[in-house]
């Protein structure tokens, strides 16, 4: 886990001042080939399509370990492609977003990622037609990781089966709070991570796993795997970089980062470059010019 943090941090540093478009294009090509390739191979049986049963609903993983892994890849790819094409094909991309969301609900039952794709679709539509209009709420977006990390960490730590409100939330998010509370009870939280911490997931098995204790929430999980100081440092970096993008007028990017921060209250990929490439764009050079973007929108509208 510490090695992962070191490698990911090095990538964050190595991408400083790199052209954001170049990074996104490379991500779309590499991740796109991987996801589409594995998906197709799972359809023809060359890669196992693990199917999970949740309350009578069959959830397909399409070649990945778990359905939410596949759904998360789709979410981040949709964000990357849509951001690259943010001034083009708005209704084609919007239709694709709706269809992709419906597909994920029907075949993966990954509700959060399906909802996140729909929210992303709405966000891209809004910014396409808003022509760079600034809303007061945008000033709060750079602090989204602080808010969402604090909420899910607090609720997980305070979770109790005797609290009906927290039990209701736990049920809504399929047991995430209970798993987080179990981690707090089982492992200590330290400044630089908990030694020998081990989260047991499905491990490629579709039946129930004895001792399952996998914590999905990125923020809660990283408290144990990376430690308090690295998590706080990452959040500070996020806030500083997001504030800079906000001051530069890159409101769409800040909104995307906020949506991802919300998604990672439940999902485990906030600081994983194979999924969330946007976290690693924080210090790249944003070559998506605000002025150019507004000019293109104005031309399209006429």
Language model segments and positions:
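Membrane-interfacial helix-loop-helix modules of multi-pass inner-membrane proteins that assemble, modify
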Residues: 33-70, 171, 207-210
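Hydrophobic transmembrane alpha-helices and their immediate junctions
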Residues: 225-261
